[in-house]
Structures are given as structure tokens and as C-alpha cells.
Amino acid sequence: MQRRFSTRLLSLTLLLILMLAAVALGGGQAAAQTDAATAKPLSPLHPVFPMLDADGRNVLESGAPVSTMQTCGSCHDTDFIASHSFHSDLGLSSMTAPGQVANGRAWDTSNGLFGKWDPITYRYLTPAGDERLDMSTADWLMTLGARVVGGGPATTSRNGEALTTLAPDAASPETNIRNADGTISAWDWSESGAAEMDCFLCHLDQPDHAARTAALAAGDFGWANTATLAATGIVTQSTSGWTWNTSAFDAEGALLPEYVRVQDPTNANCAQCHGLVHTDAATPLTLTGCDTTNPQTATTGQVISGQKIAESGVNIVDKASLSRAWDVHAERQLACTDCHYALNNPMHAQESDTTRPSHLVYDPRRLDIGEYLERPNHNFARGQSAQFTVAPELKDTMRRCESCHTVASHGSWLPYVDRHMTVLSCESCHVPHLYAPAIEKVDWTVLNADGSSVVSCRGTEDINGGIDALIEGFTPVLMMRDNIDGNPQLAPYNLISAWYWVYDDANGAKRPVPLADLQAAWFEDGAYAADLMAVFDSNRDGALDETELRLDSDAKTAAVAARLTAQGLDNPRVEGEVQPYSINHNVTRGEWATRDCQACHRDDAALNQPMQLAGFTPGGVTPSFVNDANIANSGDIVQGEDGALYFQPAPEQAGVYIFGSNRISWIDWLGLGIFLLTLGAVGLHGGLRFYMTLRNPRPKPELKRVYMYDVYERFWHWLQTVAIILLIFTGLVIHRPDMLGMFNFRYMVWLHNMLALILLVNAAMSLFYHLTSGAIRQFIPRPYGFFDQAILQAQFYLRNIFKGAPHPMEKTKDQKLNPLQQLTYFWLLNVLLPLQIVTGALMWGVQQWPVVAGMAGGLPWLAPIHTLVAWLFATFIVAHVYLTTTGPAVLTDIKAMITGWEDVEVHGHAETHPEHA
């Protein structure tokens, strides 16, 4: 029995072992099969497709470079896409003769990268007919290929012909090239191929931008798009060229699903050409100086990253306290395409106000998704940046901040929200500081030892210090942006100044000196020319440091000009320009955004802080702003006491009046002068009265007690007095917050408005009372005897009061005012008070009735008038209070205005003046 049990147990054990072995073997085979298979394709909805060459043949058969136009064109209308993309066109379609570009430089030939000269990259795309070649079309593609998506001028000539059909010609800038030794040779486009619009660059998850750029720099234009696939495993590179990987294709010649890595463009795709984008939250972000391989970051300091600045690898001053993200939108996982979408994308498309029927607020009709995928418009929604002028008809096509955000939350702390939103762009407060360096100056008047320009950056002291260089960042300058809708706004900018040499060609046309000629003027046998060293090397150490390598004397300028003249360049001279670069990213919120009213509303406000353009002025030439930037005159270029060149903001030049910051000096001096003269006159007059009273005491006059002021008269008088005094005080805080910084500006604005409302209501009720009661008559001068009695009253104040003489006019309940008082109140109540109310109301209502306020001149006119009248009211109060002391006793009139009862002098001749009885 036991043996049978043992045998059965052994059998079960063996069976279990066999089953486990089978499972293990099967599992191992399954695991092996899983390892052999690649992960799921990135885009399961995108079908597999063959790679086709320019002739439409499969590249596996031809071994030729891939044609994106043919490959992607199997399903998508690539001709439509390429012709509807300013990224591809780059200004080719707007190309014209030099100097004919609207608001461009004298030598610009288009408004895009192909034809618009950039002093940072310097090289000039030579137009046909120019005597000197700087950069031909092939040179342009080799030099700037890292920022060229292909198509447009990379495939098409300036006359619209395919580049590959042009015959090599050393005399044409479209079919020649300038060699390193300065010689010019023909370029054969049929051999190099052209660079089609590279769909892979934006629509693959891992495009090899470096390999593509290297192919373009080598002149292998036809293979550039193929090189973009280097990291996908579809193609490999060897010394003999590029080879297609047959294992990446199925038996029918189409890509295997796992190699179809097509996707919507991501931030990383955009970053290849634009600027620094960091998406890996686990890896600290680093950056190096003003790296021009990230042009947007180098020119603006903008970094697209959701990482907290404190967690980055950048060496920033007080970094530990910077708990904010580099960019709040990147932190919230927004992509570039969420704002810069295809204009016909059915999810985002919005019709222009000029074409949408006026009765429609929203048009629900959209492209079918299939129609959109076949013909997506690659003209992307864009903003109004100052530096990018290509395709101006597409500016302001993107949704802005207000499309997604409401300003309601600002109402809890920001007065005049609508007015602020009208004058200020959102970025003005929400991009208060950039924490990456940016280019400040590019100086091509001198050259570094490697033949490059001298560049200085703002926000860091060591632009060549690597990733450990200490960075402070910088505060952008606010300038008035001319918006497409005609409503200008203050917006943040970085300003890059540039100096360079220009010359006159044989036709008298101005051109920038070609780089090769500039280098030939500066160097001999790879070293600085001896005659230049004799002038520049002040310490005679055989090298040029940064204090020597600068055009800061007439002798240096003349020496370089002579060397350029020797190169055959006519009339070489230095010119300078300033290019504003718009800043729209690196947005922050909450405590990191500007929330302090006095950031703008004071003399030394950040709004008025100058931005340095250069530490000195190369060649003594003051630069001017480029003409094609969408900015209005809102500042001046000035030289500081330290010799540096600055841009000094002055928003008032563009019609912006900022309380507490802007004021008209002569208005203040005039008002203050009148006030002080009155105060001095009162002091002198009162002192003489006191002195004469001590010498000749005035005999006590006969008095009678009269109920002079009713309760309401006293109420409105004291209420008006308190309101006016507090209005003057709060107005002074608003006008000069720098002098009274202990008071909260926002609360003073609110209190000023409330007091103005009280004054207005009180004045209206007082007018109603005086009209209905008939008391208004005492304020109206009567012609009969008015001037004679006015003279008598003036004589009393100027002479007789010092003798102790009685008042010439008897004061009664029905006639409280003497002729001079009537005249004063006539102007006060009929001119000054209405003027102050009207100007104040228009200033308050500038956001409710901007058109009406604009018809009155806007704040630049209303505020100074309001200020001057306020000075006159302050002057009136001083005179008025003093004159109340001229009664029988010093406090008689004031007591009367408190109790209503007044002791008045008895005049025996009162009946002779019935008009004042």
C-alpha cells in the first residue's frame, strides 16, 4: 500500500516537473519571440508606406536619396503644403531688387531668411549683378542650413525655375560658390541635388538634425533629407555614402510598422531650429552662454522648459529661491502647436473678422478631417514678433493670452483693469525677468583671432565660461508695440545692437563688406595685420585683449578703413543698428509676476530703467533702430556718464501717460510757483497785520449776532472742504508716489475716486439747494457799482486793513460775499470746478469711454490740466483760509461756519449800498 502510494507520488512529481519544463521552454520561446519583435509603432493610425525617390521609384531599387515630396505625396498634397509654408518659402516669393523691400535695409532683397541680412550671422546673400560675391544660394544653404526646412529657395531659383535645371555658371550667384581661398567656381545643382521640404524634420520622433545639417554643410543637398533618418535605423552611413537598410522594409518595399515613427510635431522638433527646449524633467537643464545654435534663446533669453529653475543645472544667482518654472505653459504640458497651429486645422481654425459674416460670432463649419490631412496648411498661426518679418499678412493669426485666460482675477487687486489690458501686453507683467543670457551687442567693426565678430551678452559676465558660468539674467525693456489691430501696447523686448562696415559698390549702392574681404583686411598669414597691431596693441604684448580690440579712436577707425580701401572697397564706413527682439515666452504667474503698482507708477520704475546697448560706441557711430520692427517711438538712445550706450524708455513719446511716472515739469513748477507766491503773500500780509495790530491796536467795532449759515450750508461746506483737501493729498500721492511711498498707491487711487464721487454728489446737491432757495443770487455779481466796490474792497485788503479800518461792505445772511469774493467764486464754480470735474471724469472713464477721452487729447492732455487745476485749488484754500481771519476776530468766520452764528460789524452806511444789503 505504501509502495503503491510512493510510486503514484513519484509519477505525479515527474509529471509536474515535465509540465514545468514545458512551461519554461514555451515561456522562453515566447520571450525570445517577444524580444525579436519590436515595440508597437509610434503612430498606430498611420499606414505603412514605401520610401520613394524623386522619380517615384522605391529607394530599395534605385538606391537614390528619398524624396519627401514623392514619399509623403502619395497621400498628402505636398505641393500644396510646400506652397503654403512660410517656413519653406523664407522670403523667396517676396524677393525683389536690393533696397525695394518695404522698410528694409538698403541692401535687403526680401523680408525672410532668404534675402534679409542679419548682422548676427552677417553673411549677405548676393543679388544678381553685384560686383562682389559674399554668399551664393549654395553658400546660403551650406551656412544657414541648420535653420532651413527645405523647399522654397533650397529647390527653386529666384526666377521660379528648379535649381537642378540650372546650368553651372561661375558668374551667377545662383550657380556659383565662393571657395575658402576666395576664388569663385561654378556650382552644379544637378550633381549636388536640391533640399526638398523635409517632412521628417518635424514629423519624426527622432530626426537626426545634426546629420542633416552636416550633409547640407558638405553640399550634399539631395541627401540631406535622407540624413534626417540616420537615427531611425532605416538608413546607415558609411564612407561610401548612405545605404538603405532592407530589413526595415517588408517584402513589398514598404516600411515595417515599427519603423513608422510619424507623429505630430513636438516641442523638441521645433527646438531644432528655434531655441532651447528641455522636456526631460529628470535631467537638470543646462545651457552655455549665448549659444547661437539656439537662436531664439541666444537673442531673447527664452528657454522652453517646465522644470523648476531651482532644480536646473544652470548656475544662476540665488537659484535656490527660484521655485518657479522656466515657462509656466511648458510646465502645464502645452506644446508649441497648441498656439502655433496650422491655420486650417479644424480643431483650432478661426476665421478672420474681415471675411466672417458680421452676423456670426462663431462659424461651426470646418474642414473634414480627411480633407485636412490631405492638405494641411503649413502656414502656422503666428504672433507679431519684431524680428520676424516674413509673411506679414499672417501676423496676429494666433490666439493670444486673452483667448484662454480671463482678466477677472486681476480685478481683486488691480484698478482700471481694462485700461491696463489696453496699454500693457500680458507679457509686460508676466515675463518680468529672463534667467538666461542673451546677446547684447554684435561688433563686426573688429574681428576676433578666429575671424568672428566680438559679441557681448547681457545677463552673464562670462559668455565663454561654459555651463558653470554665473548667470544673473536680465530684465527686458518695455517698448510700444504697433499691433495689427491699430491698438499699440507696451511689450517686453531684448535689444541687440550691431556695428559693421559698409561700402559703396561701382553703382553707388551701399552694401555690407563681404566677410572674406573683412577678414582679408584684418589678417595676414593667419595673424592680425602688423599695421593694425601697431594701432590696436596699446600695451605691446603682441595680443589684443577686449579693451584693445575695439574701435574707440579715430586712429583705429582710419587704420581699418585704409585696409578695406586697399581691398578695393570704396568709401568704407561704420554703421550701427538696433534690432528689437520680442519676448513672449517664459511666462510666469502669481508672486513671480509683477503685481506692485509702483513697479510702474513712480519715477525710478522698472518701466523707465534704461537697457544697455553697448559698453562703448564703436567708431563713435550712434546706432538707429531698424525700420521694419513693429515698434513706435517710445524712447531714446543716449550715452551715459560711464561712456556706455543705453536705450532710455520714454512711453510718453508714444502717447502713454503713466501716473506717478509721467508729468510735465513746467506744469508742476507753475502750479508750485503760484502756490508758494500765494503762501508767501499770505505770510507777508499776515505778518504786517500782526505788526500793525501791536503798534496800533484796532478799536473794538460795534457787532451784532446774525444767524448766517443754515445747517445744510455748513454741512456741504465742511464736506466739500474735507473732500477737496483729501483729494489734493491723494492726488499728490498719485502724482508723486516717489515722495510719498509709504502710502499704498492702489488704495490712494481708490480713495481718490471715492472722494471725487462724494465731491461731485455734494456739488450737485449744493447747486440744487442754491437754485431752489434763491441763494444762488449772492454768487452772481451785479454790474451796477460792482467795479467801484471791488476797488474799495481791494483797497481795504491792501491798505486800510492795516489801519484797523472796518470792512467796506456789510455782510448779511442774504449777501455774504463781497465783490472780490463773488469774482473769485465765479471763476471757481464756473471754470475751475467744472474743468476739474470734466478732466477727472474723463481720466476715470478712460477705459469706459476711450474714444471720448481720446477726443479730449487723452491722458497726456487731461492729466496735466487736472494737475494744474489741483494746484489752483490748493492755492485757493490757502487764500480762503487766510481771508477768514480778516473778520472782527481771527476765528470769527470759522466759528460761524461751525455754529451758524456770526458776529458781524454794524455799518451805518449799509443802506447806501442796497445791492449789498
For each feature predicted by the language model, list its residue ranges.
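Catalytic metal-binding/acid-base residues of hydrolase active sites
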Residues: L18, P432, Y882
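Exposed boundary/loop context
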Residues: M19-L20, F49, V535, I724, ...
